[in-house]
Amino acid sequence: MKKAVVLLSGGLDSTTCMSVAHKAGYELYPLSFDYGQRHQRELEAAKAVAQYYKVKEHRLIKIEHVGGSALTDASIQVPDYTEDGQIPVTYVPARNILFLSYALGYGEVMGAEAIFIGISSVDYSGYPDCRPEFLQAFQKVVDVGTKAGVSGQTIAIKAPLLYLSKAETIQLAAENGAPLHHTTSCYRGGEKACGTCDSCTLRLKGFAEAGIKDPIDYVNQGDRSCFSTPLED
């Protein structure tokens, strides 16, 4: 069976990505990261998702000395959702470069054909490492900088959600039977999702537009003025 490394955060996008890889017939090898993020609950969610798919191995990599972000530094406040067009303080420097590099090394050792990453350039927070240009550049690195690549057996970097809106991602997850009830998206990392951070707002907006009820609990459901479809109470 063909093998795939799946970058699994425990969030909505990575879980949907996992469902796509599963449906495509890959043997799944999820990889999760503890980089000191304040939303440690996502690691519990990732474990639950991995167990749902009955994977052979779920690796957790600890990365130290990552900082400079509201997601890692207690001194930087996680802001509520905004559409100011700026790269937000929740950007973690070089995060996807680090994650993909670890996944690439792991994948080359165990003979993976693909690495799945749940990035999107549509409904996203403006992070530069979630754009098509980044994905294309990293694929080039794989092609010319690995034994697999120069031997003509390169590892494909797959981002099936890259051009999907959040609503389309949620619809795809529903079609694939992805366990979204196990997921968490909140940057603040409380027992219940806050409902007002960037990630919560984009998630709630996506569920509203998809016409599907979000299976997780929120402290509140934030500012609904940005939703084209009203949320159900």
From Swiss-Prot:
GO terms for biological process: queuosine biosynthetic process. Keywords: ATP-binding, Ligase, Metal-binding, Nucleotide-binding, Queuosine biosynthesis, Zinc. InterPro entries: QueC, Rossmann-like_a/b/a_fold. Binds 1 zinc ion per subunit. It comes from the Bacteria. Zn(2+) binds at C186, C194, C197, C200. One of its GO terms (molecular function) is zinc ion binding. Its cofactor is Zn(2+). Its EC number is 6.3.4.20. Pathway: Purine metabolism; 7-cyano-7-deazaguanine biosynthesis. It catalyses: 7-carboxy-7-deazaguanine + NH4(+) + ATP = 7-cyano-7-deazaguanine + ADP + phosphate + H2O + H(+). The keyword Ligase applies. Gene3D superfamilies: HUPs. ATP binds at L8, S9, G10, G11, L12, D13, S14, T15, T16, C17, M18. Homodimer. Belongs to the QueC family. Catalyzes the ATP-dependent conversion of 7-carboxy-7-deazaguanine (CDG) to 7-cyano-7-deazaguanine (preQ(0)). This is 7-cyano-7-deazaguanine synthase 2. The gene is queC2.
